[in-house]
């Protein structure tokens, strides 16, 4: 049988298709990766109340501090957002598997009335963002007003 026969040409074509398909599947994001990318928007957070402050701890693994924003909107809503980005691909380098999550995340928290929006600090360490919102001092109790009664 000749190597240029239609049968061998067909077999080579099928083998080339299989190689291309296998290579594409190795480089394609997995279903888990696509599904879990949505999880970046619902990142876990804990909120604690201390005697003088509220502390918000938000998991932000792999998010660089320069890609994190902490804002107050509408005078009482703490908005925390960030984005985990994929590294730029270098020429000649390709992913064989993509499982790590990338994407944007955002969490909003309604602040209590006694939150001091002028005294907020944030620090990112070991993949956890800690935002501290100090409390306003309690209002002083109102003293009764005494009205002087005049003689007519």
UniProtKB/Swiss-Prot annotation:
SUPFAM superfamilies, per the entry: HSP20-like chaperones (SSF49764)
InterPro entries per UniProt: A-crystallin/Hsp20_dom, HSP20-like_chaperone, Small_HSP
Pfam families: HSP20 (PF00011)
Alphabetically ordered keywords of this record: Cytoplasm, Stress response
UniProt feature coiled coil, ranges: none
Keyword Endoplasmic reticulum: no
Cellular compartment(s): Cytoplasm
GO CC terms in record: cytoplasm
Matches recorded under Gene3D superfamilies: 2.60.40.790
Superkingdom of origin: Eukaryota
Span of domain sHSP: 36-152
Bilayer-crossing regions: none
Family to which the UniProt record says this protein belongs: Belongs to the small heat shock protein (HSP20) family.
Full protein name: 17.1 kDa class II heat shock protein
Native organism: Pisum sativum
